[in-house]
Amino acid sequence: MSVLIDEKSHRSSGSTRSRIVVTVVGVLLMVSGLAVMLGHQSGSANEALGMEYEKPSVEVLDLEATEVEQLTKLGLSPKPKLKIVKGGDEQVLHGRFLHITDMHPDKYYKTGADVGSLCHSGKGSAGKYGDAVLGCDSPMVLMEDTLKWVKENLKDKIDFVVWTGDNVRHDNDRRYPRTESNIFDMNQRVSELMYETFKEENPRGGRPRQLKIPLVPSLGNNDVFPHNLFSPGPTLQTRELFKIWHDFVPAAQLHIFNRGAYFFKEIIPNELAVLSINTLYLFQSNPLVDNCDRKKDPGHKLFEWLGYTLKEMRARNMKVWLSGHVPPNEKNYDISCLRKYIVWMHEYRDVIIGGLYGHMNIDHFIPLDSKEAYKSIKNKFGKLGFDYELSFENDLYVSDDDDNSDSDSDDDDEDTSLEESYSNFNSPILKDGFEDSVNFKNMDDIRIQGGVPNGKVGYMENVRKEYYANVKGKKKSGYVSERYSIAHVTASVVPTFNSGLRVWEYNITGLQNLLTSDNQPRFAPWNEFFEGLEKLMETQVEADYDDEFITFGQQVEIFKNDNTFPPKMPKSKSLGPAYIPQAFTPERYVQYYADLANINRGEKEFSYEFEYATDDKVYDMDSLTVDDWISLARRLGKPVKEKKNKSNKKSKKKKKNKDKRLLENSEPLKQDGSKDSRLEQDRVQQSARLENLWQHYLKYSFVSSEYENMGMG
């Protein structure tokens, strides 16, 4: 429990909020400090605090020939494993994990039914395993055989599973209305199937129920009743969810979980964790919550939990993945939630590896711009004293005379705003003031989802225009693109397109030395942290920004004490695995898909097959750091950016001058061709290559279903 520390002193060291924190956990803070300090002292000192420490033994295991063959067949990297033994517990690390999402099993699905009836009745062409693009949910056999394939092919090759929700069918057939009982039952059924898939076949220590590898679920918008609507806890839903997920959620986090269905799971003790975030509290389509700035709303409490948890992870020198169902973007999150989410990722870039999400069924990635987020915060809170120094160009980033061949010129980069992005995604900002808001903001809040996908190519073109083409050059992004963080959205099992699964590979080189170091700090047990955290979360602040008779001075004081805004990352901290290659840095991933059309025709046995890998000749990514993703974003967005710049005479002039400088030392054409024609030829070839890259990206976004060629918008 090394850090229940108030880090808001950079705004108000003597504030009421600070005094409350110290009063609640003052004694815990003293023990916390001792835990860190004594980490490098003698063992007897640690034992005196009840923190016995046993150094694990770590053994490198070479692969057998059959293992190499299996991995190669799956397109995975054959690399040595690590066997960790501590306190009688054994863990084998492969440097891989699985991300699975959006199974949407439908017990009413009938093979041969009419797709117009959502495959529930009539006579038609509904395939045994479901059909891409036709709009039905998953047959039960698709979910069952998917998990059977995972068990047979991946279970013994991965370290953990990230499972990002939507385990219930869509509520889109009035003939078969969903009830709360139905939803609990299906969640229970899917959870039991997941447990059976990943359980330890030979449990140790007489424990009858034991997972072979950790599994981290998160709550989907269709896992609740009614869909999208989720109240602040504790509620019947949070209590039932804890019962359903009792194999996955640590018992010590029961009280925190009951507040809002968020928790975290240690993957490698004191080294790596996955945070499960209830994104329904950030979701614009949840009409039971308003925003993430009002203290009475659950989104505000979620960010309190996130802040305290990340501080503890930093103090323990742990690294984390964030996971959740709904990805952070302008279509999904309330602006007050999105900007906070982005700046927390930015200020904990020494800790956070990345974010893993589902919900959208489209395989793509989203660059999150910290400068845009901070500008948006200033727009709202500047009058209350928000004066965060945006020193990106002068502090984190490269100098004007730095020349980097991977960068587009920053000269044509215009600063954009988060507010503009909401407008461009046709996602209006319905509330971002301090006044009271009304629930059920528009009918989109209760819209029915699922069905035939329409307009998804248009969405991806907007992603290209608003995200990729607006990525800044190196001078404004940083040596390793520190300005940005990345949200990864993976393909779903439900056949919105073809079914998809993703296996990530990450760096475990050097982990052996890290785990066996004599300088490993000792920490108090996690249950002490949770006890202190519960007390902090129970602390209520009466005044809120939108209280009826609130004064401006009181609003200023509330903002000073608002700990849902992160402190700046300490300059003493180094960038983490997301930015600099080290232990836990993502190296590559392999995407698998089920070719449903050929499987349903009987031309293939049911199986998932290799679709692509990030290091293949299409993407050609050496690793998966943020800088690698930003480089890919620049390539994907460059044609759009150049088209935009051509309409700017000043930009064209700068481009011409740059071309002249590039040609000063080039050799003349051997025949009668001019330098201008040579440049034009190069541009045409590059444009063709980039367009080919975009077409491949669209193909993979829609999971090789040919959706991008179907004319569905």
From Swiss-Prot:
This is Endopolyphosphatase. Residues 640-659 have a biased composition (Basic residues). Keywords: Glycoprotein, Hydrolase, Membrane, Signal-anchor, Transmembrane, Transmembrane helix, Vacuole. Residues 1-19 are cytoplasmic. Residues 399-418 have a biased composition (Acidic residues). It is found in: Vacuole membrane. It comes from Debaryomyces hansenii (strain ATCC 36239 / CBS 767 / BCRC 21394 / JCM 1990 / NBRC 0083 / IGC 2968) (Yeast). GO terms for biological process: polyphosphate catabolic process. InterPro entries: ASMase/PPN1_MPP, Calcineurin-like_PHP_ApaH, EndopolyPtase_N1, Metallo-depent_PP-like. Residues 41-713 are vacuolar. One of its GO terms (cellular component) is nucleus.
